[in-house]
Amino acid sequence: MNKIFLLFFALILLNSATFAQIKKSKKEKNQNVETVITDSVQWRKDHYVINRDSAYADPRIGLKKLMGGNRRFVEGKSIRPRQDAETIKKLEKGQEPFATIVGCSDSRVPNEMIFDQGLGDLFIIRTAGQVSAAASYGSMEFAVLKLKTKLIVVLGHTECGAVAAAVSRPEDVPGHIVTLINEIKQSVAKSSYLPGDPVNNAVRQNVIDQVMTLRDLDPILHKI
C-alpha cells in the first residue's frame, strides 16, 4: 500500500512538470485537475483519512480519526503523516494535538505508530498499566486547559505486563512496583468471575475503572 501512496504524489508532480512544459487548453487543464481531485478523494476514502482540523474541533471526529489510523496500521496502509520539515517548523510555534492518549508504557504499543498519526497530533501520557496519579492528572488538565484538547482516550492493550503481575498476585514486590499492582488489583477482582483470559479481562476492566475515575475528577476533567 505504500507504493500506492508514493504513486499518488508522483502523479501530481508529473502533472505539474507537464503543465510547465506543454501549453494546453483551459478545458484540458480543468479535466486534469478534476482527475487529480477525484483521485485524492478516493485515496482519502481508501485510507480512512479524516480532516485534522475537524478532528481537533470535534472529539467525535477525533475518535474516528484515531480509529481510521489504527485501521490503516492493522491493514498495512500506514501513511505516517505530518513528519516533514514544514510540519516540524510549524510546530516550533506551538502544538494543537487533537487527542490526549493515556496509555501503557509497554514498548510494543507506540501510540503514534498504532494510530498512524504524526508530529503534534497526540498528547501522550504513559505509565505501566496506564495507572494514573497526581502528575498524570495534571498533565491531562494541561492538555485540556492549555492545548484545548477535547478528546481523552484511555488505551489498554492485550497481554499487559502490569496487569498480568496484578493477576498473578506476587509476594515481596520490590520498590514502587507494588504501587502499580495495588492500583490494578481492584480491576482484577471485578473481572475475576468473567470467562476467558483473566489478564485480558482485567485489562478491559482496568480501562473502564480509569475512565470512571477521570469522570469523577473535579473540576476540569469532569467536564470532558
Say what each PLM segment does.
Residues 1-25:
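Bacterial Sec-dependent N-terminal signal peptides
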Residues 95-100, 106-112:
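Active-site alpha/beta core segments
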